[in-house]
Amino acid sequence: MKAAGIATWIQSKFSFHTLFLLIFVGALLLRLWALDLKLFHHDEAVHAWFSYRLLQEGIYVYDPSYHGPFLYYATAGMFALLGDSDLVGRLLPALFGVSLIPLVYSIHRLGYLDERQTLLASFFIALSPEMVYFSRFLRQDIFQVAFTLLLLVALLYYHSHGRLRYAALAGLAAGLGMTLKEDMPLLLLILLLYGIYLLWSKKISLPCSWRRDALVSFFVFVGTMLLFYSSFGTHPEVIFGQILDPGYIQVNGLFSAINQTGWYRAAEHWISMHNMCRICGPWFFYLVLLILYELPILILAVAGTIQFTMRGFSLSKLL
């Protein structure tokens, strides 16, 4: 039986919601089964230790070498609720990894994906080697994927319904993403540029209340970052550096005061890191990994790009 025939037979035996639930349960099992089987990776051990220290001593100050604060506060919270162990440390990444599938369903509810596309997207997320791996790994990556997808869902709901709560949710998702890793600004820039393109080409329009909604979203976005990066107000110097100290500015100058902020130190640190050959390899290094581990998804991504640029091409012919 051909693949298309198998898919048709499965759809005739099971309803859409039954298949979706089976995919969700399968994703849950892949992410939770023997979650503490491996010893902590070096990165995981560092993150778990900082989280444990935060729980026990209440000590955390943003250090750009170890990325943003969200992971440490969230993991410390899990340790407080369930005890400190390898399993508990990896539990939140696993749950965030599973949350991607309900987020795909949310896009389906808006009509952007039909039932077959929703099942296919959920199936690939559930089985993707990289998604499964990082869902079982105490690092920022899977959280960033989840918050980016949540941001997309919030923006789509705002476009469809124009309600303030979706704008606020978009601001929260973007703000939380900014508290994870320093590459989130690049993801936000991509979304912003695409949004500007859609508005400029009149493919979308904004509701009458968009100014109010954008302002609320901005305050939620900034407020979320201020709370986390200042360690909930205990380390305002991460936000302001020495800008609020006139004596320091008088002696050392304004530029030196700005140099002490977490924002400046993060940019300085990661620019210097990228100027080093830390993980050397050819420009196509990650393309090889995609071909090796994610070939079906890569093929569909290329087909989707072709469909977007050549409107006469129908992706449904491939599905």
Task: Give, region by region, the residue ranges found by the protein language model.
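Short hydrophobic alpha-helices at membrane interfaces in multi-pass membrane enzymes
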Residues: 19-21, 116-121, 154-175, 317-319
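Loop-to-helix entry region of an early transmembrane alpha helix in multi-pass inner-membrane enzymes
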Residues: 69-73, 83-102, 134, 138
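Short helix- or helix-capping micro-motifs
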Residues: 24-27, 121-126, 174, 178
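Extracytoplasmic catalytic/substrate-binding loops of multi-pass membrane glycan-assembly enzymes
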Residues: 37-48, 61-74, 84-87, 276-283
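Membrane-interface transmembrane helices that cradle and orient dolichyl/undecaprenyl
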Residues: 3, 10-13, 109-112, 151-167, ...
